C-alpha cells in the first residue's frame, strides 16, 4: 500500500529539491529543521508572550507542567500533519478535496483564511508597540505603512520565497533564544521553584467555573489558563505544517526528518514560553500587563539596562515573526482550498497573502487613530474559531488514519489517544469561546 504513495510523493517536487542531499554541504541537523520553526514562529507571537508573562506574574512557576502538556498536544498535531504531507504526497486540503470533494476543502481554506485575516490586525499592533518601545518618537501608523509596503514588495520580488523565509526564521529563533535566555539568567530565578513547577498542581483562586456576565462585564475564572491553551496549542498552525513540508520538498525518505523537525519546533515553542514565564515569575510577580508595550515598560526598572535592551530586541523579533507568516498561512491555504497551486512562490497565494496583510494593516491603523479595539472584528474571528479549530483537528486525525493515504504509517494507538485528547481540548475551548460570544452579544 505504501508504494503508490511513495511514488506520488515525487510528483510535484521541484527538480531543484531532488537529490538535494547529494549536493548540499550544510550539516544534516541544519537541513533537518525548517518547516516546524516557521510554525513555532507564528504560534509564539506577541499574544503567546503576553500570556506566558502574565501567567508567570500571576501564578509563578506553578503552571509550567501545563505548558509542557500543551506542548505535547501541539507536537502530536504538528508531527501528524507533517507525516500526512510527507507520506500522502500532497497538502492536507488537496487530500481532502480528492476524497470528500472541493467544497469541503474550500470551507477549510476560506475559514482559515478569514481567521488569519481577522487576527492580522493584532500582529500589526504588536509590531507598532514593539517599534514604539525601541524608538518612542516614531509615528506607529507610518511604521505600519512602511513595514507592510516593504514586505509586499519583497513578496513579489523574491524568487525562492520559502528558502528565504526558512533561513530568516532560523535567525529569528536564534535571536529570540539568545535574548530571552540572557534575560532569565540575569533574573536568577529559583531553581527549586522551577522544578516544583513541573509537578502538576492547581493555583489557589483559579476555579473551573464557566464565564459569567457580572455588572455588564464578562468574568472568566479560567481566562489565563484558556489563553495558554489557545495560544500554545494552535491547530491552524499545526494544519499548515502539512503544507510546509511540501514546500520543503520532503518525500518518504525524509519521513524521520519531518518528525524530528516537528519535535524541534515544539521544543523551541514550549522552551521560549517557559523562559518568559520563569522570567516574569521572578521579575514582576503580581503585576500582569495589558499589552507587550506595557510589559516592556514594567520590566525596564526591574531588569538591568543591558537585560532590558535584550528583552526589547527579543520582543521585536517576536512581533515580527508571525506578521508575514500568519498572512501567508491564510493566503496559501485559501488558494489550496479553492483548487489553486498552493506553493508560496505561486501567484494566487501571494495575492491572497497581500489581501490579508492589507486588511490587517487598515484595521490596525484605524484602531491606532481612534484608540478603540475593533470589537466586532474580534467577535467575528472568535466565532470562526468555534467552527474552524475542531474542523481542522478532525481533518488531521481523519487523514492520518486513512490507509489509502498513510499506508503502513497510519497513526498508532498512542498517537490517536493523544490526538483524541487534543481534539477534546479543542472542542472544550470552542465551547468556552461560544459561551463568551453569547454573553458578549446578549
Describe the function of each predicted region.
Residues 87, 105-137, 144-148, 319-338, ...:
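Hydrophobic transmembrane alpha-helices that form the core helical bundles
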Residues 75-87, 245-246, 267-294:
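Extracellular/periplasmic helix-exit of transmembrane alpha-helices
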Residues 27, 54-79, 93-98, 102-106, ...:
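Extracellular loop-to-transmembrane helix junctions
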Residues 21-29, 60, 86-117, 134-140, ...:
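Transmembrane-helix boundary/entry motifs in multi-pass membrane transporters
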Residues 1-50, 174, 224-225, 250-256, ...:
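Membrane-interface "cap" regions at the ends of multi-pass membrane proteins
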Residues 52-56, 79-104, 129-135, 160-164, ...:
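Flexible loop linkers connecting adjacent transmembrane helices
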Residues 174-213, 222-226, 231-242, 395-404, ...:
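Hydrophobic alpha-helical segments and their helix-loop junctions in multi-pass secondary transporters
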Residues 109, 134-158, 174-179, 346-363, ...:
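Transmembrane alpha-helical segments of multi-pass small-molecule transport proteins
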Amino acid at each position: 500500500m505504501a508504494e503508490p504513495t511513495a511514488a506520488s510523493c515525487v510528483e510535484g517536487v521541484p527538480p531543484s529539491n531532488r537529490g538535494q542531499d547529494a549536493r548540499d554541504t550544510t550539516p544534516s541537523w541544519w537541513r533537518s529543521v525548517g518547516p516546524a520553526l516557521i510554525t513555532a514562529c507564528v504560534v509564539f507571537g506577541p499574544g503567546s508572550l503576553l500570556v506566558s508573562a502574565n501567567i508567570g506574574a500571576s501564578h509563578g512557576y506553578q503552571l509550567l507542567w501545563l505548558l509542557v502538556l500543551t506542548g505535547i498536544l501541539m507536537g502530536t498535531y504538528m508531527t501528524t500533519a507533517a507525516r500526512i504531507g510527507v507520506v500522502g504526497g500532497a497538502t492536507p486540503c488537496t487530500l481532502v478535496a480528492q476524497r470528500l470533494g472541493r467544497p469541503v476543502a474550500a470551507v477549510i481554506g476560506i475559514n482559515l483564511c478569514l481567521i488569519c485575516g481577522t487576527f492580522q490586525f493584532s500582529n500589526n499592533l504588536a509590531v507598532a508597540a514593539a517599534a514604539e518601545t525601541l524608538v518612542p518618537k516614531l509615528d506607529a501608523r507610518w511604521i505600519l505603512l512602511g513595514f507592510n509596503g516593504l514586505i509586499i514588495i519583497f513578496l513579489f520580488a523574491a524568487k525562492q520565497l520559502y528558502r528565504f523565509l526558512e533561513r530568516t526564521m532560523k535567525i529569528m529563533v536564534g535571536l529570540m533564544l539568545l535574548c530571552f535566555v540572557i534575560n532569565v539568567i540575569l533574573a536568577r530565578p529559583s531553581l527549586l521553584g522551577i522544578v516544583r513547577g513541573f509537578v502538576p498542581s492547581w493555583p489557589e483562586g483559579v476555579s473551573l467555573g464557566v464565564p459569567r456576565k457580572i455588572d455588564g462585564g464578562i468574568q472568566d475564572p479560567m481566562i489565563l489558563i484558556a489563553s495558554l491553551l489557545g495560544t500554545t496549542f494552535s491547530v491552524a498552525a499545526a494544519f499548515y505544517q502539512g503544507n510546509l513540508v511540501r514546500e520543503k520538498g520532503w518525500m518518504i525518505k525524509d519521513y524521520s526528518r519531518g518528525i524530528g523537525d516537528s519535535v524541534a519546533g515544539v521544543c523551541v515553542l514550549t522552551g521560549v514560553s517557559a523562559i518568559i514565564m520563569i522570567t516574569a515569575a521572578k521579575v514582576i510577580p503580581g503585576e500582569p500587563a495589558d499589552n507587550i508595550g506595557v510589559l516592556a515598560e514594567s520590566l525596564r526598572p526591574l531588569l538591568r539596562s543591558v537585560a532590558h535592551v535584550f528583552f526589547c530586541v527579543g520582543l521585536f523579533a517576536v512581533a515580527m515573526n508571525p506578521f508575514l507568516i500568519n498572512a501567508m498561512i491564510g493566503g496559501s491555504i485559501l488558494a489550496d482550498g479553492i483548487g489553486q497551486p498552493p506553493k508560496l512562490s505561486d501567484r494566487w497565494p501571494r495575492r491572497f497573502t497581500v489581501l490579508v496583510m492589507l486588511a490587517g494593516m487598515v484595521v490596525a491603523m484605524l484602531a491606532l487613530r481612534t484608540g478603540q479595539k475593533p470589537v466586532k472584528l474580534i467577535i467575528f474571528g472568535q466565532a470562526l474559531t468555534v467552527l474552524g479549530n475542531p474542523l481542522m483537528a478532525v481533518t488531521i486525525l481523519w487523514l492520518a488514519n486513512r490507509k489509502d493515504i498513510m499506508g503502513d504509517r497510519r497513526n498508532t494507538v498512542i498517537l490517536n489517544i493523544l490526538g483524541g485528547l487534543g481534539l477534546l481540548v479543542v472542542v472544550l475551548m470552542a465551547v468556552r469561546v461560544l459561551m463568551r460570544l453569547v454573553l458578549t452579544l446578549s
